[in-house]
Amino acid sequence: MIWVIIPTYNEEKALPHTIKSVLSQPTPYRVIVVDGGSTDRTLEVLHRNSQISWCMAPKGRASQMNAGARFALQQQASADDWLLFLHADTQLPCGAFQELHHLASDPSSQAGGFRHRFSGKNWRLRMISWLDNLRCTHSHIIYGDQALFVRQGLFTQLGGFPMQAVLEDVVFGQTLLTKTTPRLLPLTVITDSRKFIKMGIWRSFIRVLLIILHVEFGLPTFSPAFFRDVR
């Protein structure tokens, strides 16, 4: 079974496309959306989709994704089931779940993610994605926007995502490496470029570069203001 966990906060624009990309995949799967107190029409989007389970949790990706994992466990997720953490602005490719169903019978496959690119044709965003994919190939640390998947039993054993405001995916990825080497699948997830264009593409590029330097060389982390919400 694949449990898709989507943290949301004011994602009315991108969420319908993300949900569509999930519901077009072959079963079996369950979709759990964990909302952090949206003030837009995100909850209306959820109410229109009867195939989706949802709950509330304190705002913050770590808090919301951990809540989704607990929800899956309460719904009898087994240790070998996949937990797939999907950002609300990121769409799965066709064939994503076939890959996961294929890996399910391989006990050596414990975690992984997908290659990444942004929507649109902006060459600077393509460069960011290329750099990010290269980084992942070298470090084996899966970022949140790469649709991280991990066995439920291993996720629980590791204690879930660390409760911190930023870089929870990076820290979890480092912890994950102590137990397994995540697989980078050849399929590509697509993240809506709207937020990154609004933030400023060069700012986005610098942010990715600084995160890579933090991961690869242990440079200090950055203030939460640097990772402010852009809607």
What kind of region is each of these model predictions?
Residues Q174-R231:
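Hydrophobic helical membrane-anchoring modules
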Residues I6, K20, P28-G37:
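Short beta-strand/loop segment that forms part of the nucleotide-sugar
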Residues C94-R124:
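Conserved donor NDP-sugar-binding/catalytic core segment of glycosyltransferases
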Residues K13-H17, D40-R48, G95:
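Acidic helix N-cap motif at the loop->helix transition within catalytic regions
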Residues N10-S24:
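Short, well-formed alpha-helical segments that are part of the catalytic scaffolds
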Residues D35-L43, D89-Q91:
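A conserved acidic beta->alpha catalytic loop
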Residues L83:
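Short aromatic/hydrophobic "clamp" motif used to bind/position activated sugar donors
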Residues L43-F71, Q75:
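Conserved donor nucleotide-binding strand/loop of the catalytic core
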